[in-house]
Amino acid sequence: MANTLEQLKSYTTIVADTGDIEAIKRYQPEDATTNPSLILKAAQIPEYSALIDNAIAWAKLQSADIEQQIDDASDKLAVNIGVEILKLVPGRISTEVDARLSFDKEKSIAKAHKLVRLYQEAGVDKSRILIKLASTWEGICAAKELEQEGINCNLTLLFSFAQARACAEAGVYLISPFVGRILDWYKKDTGKDYDAVNDPGVVSVTEIYNYYKQHGYNTVVMGASFRNIGEIIELAGCDRLTIGPSLLEELANSQVAIQPKLIPASTTVAAGEPLTEAQFRWDFNQDPMAVDKLAEGIRNFAIDQGKLEVMLKAKLAN
């Protein structure tokens, strides 16, 4: 019998949630996703030193201003890592906009344009890129405009139905609902443990998936942020699942037989009127878990972005 990972691949597109080239070679995913935390981790891998050196040298040619050099080196490094990953995956790479721009639509759009340009200068067509944005109202509005330009987006840090609905209504290419972080919040809040079937993160993604399919939305649902393979198995059939190397290894070493759990609706019905900004903010605010986890996620990505910039600043000074 095929291992659990190979079985899963027959129902769901598997995406590697890592910047580690060796892990991607090992598990042969369709796509890969990165974020500031993963870029920071990847930047400490010795094999990547040439990519960092290239980003530093390039940034020095763009500007004499150190703050601009740091910004440029950070963007160039993310793209350099993405370009390497794209040599190994047949599909797409997700590269994230600076989390500190999560509440600034115009600057998010400008950063997305810059990342796309850097990829194109490296010979990568925009059809192989997903621009990652936090699922704030401003991020969703930025994505709507980018999608209209033909730049596909991955809306991340998604914890609530309101965020998912707004993304679909904006015509976003893909969303990344965070399964494990939802579970973390509920375990801490209630003091209870949950099995995979009743896992609040699994329940959330299932609800979003069913809503999208019932209403004929084309937005791809990509479950993310897993804590155990039980969550992953319960979401077999989801459009895509992005999984870190340790859980990919566990799935590859497992012989558990799986069946699709998420099955698209056979008929669709028209959706209602799109959410207004006021409705979105109210609905989102009614979910304390989502409010907490979105804010925390943005803060933590910003912290790791800052750590990366400290490292780059030291290298730029040499």
Swiss-Prot record:
Q: Top enzyme class of this protein?
A: transferase
Active-site residues? 132 (schiff-base intermediate with substrate)
Please indicate if the UniProt record lists Cytoplasm as a keyword. yes
What keywords are annotated for this sequence in UniProt? Cytoplasm, Pentose shunt, Schiff base, Transferase
Q: Name one GO cellular component term.
A: cytosol
Q: Its domain of life?
A: Bacteria
Localization, UniProt: Cytoplasm
Pathway, per Swiss-Prot/TrEMBL?
Carbohydrate degradation; pentose phosphate pathway; D-glyceraldehyde 3-phosphate and beta-D-fructose 6-phosphate from D-ribose 5-phosphate and D-xylulose 5-phosphate (non-oxidative stage): step 2/3
Annotated EC: 2.2.1.2
Q: A GO molecular-function term, please? A: transaldolase activity
The similarity annotation says: Belongs to the transaldolase family. Type 1 subfamily.
- Described function: Transaldolase is important for the balance of metabolites in the pentose-phosphate pathway.
Subunit structure, as described in the record: Homodimer.
Protein name as annotated: Transaldolase
Q: Which organism is it from?
A: Shewanella sp. (strain MR-7)
Task: Provide the gene name from the record.
Answer: tal
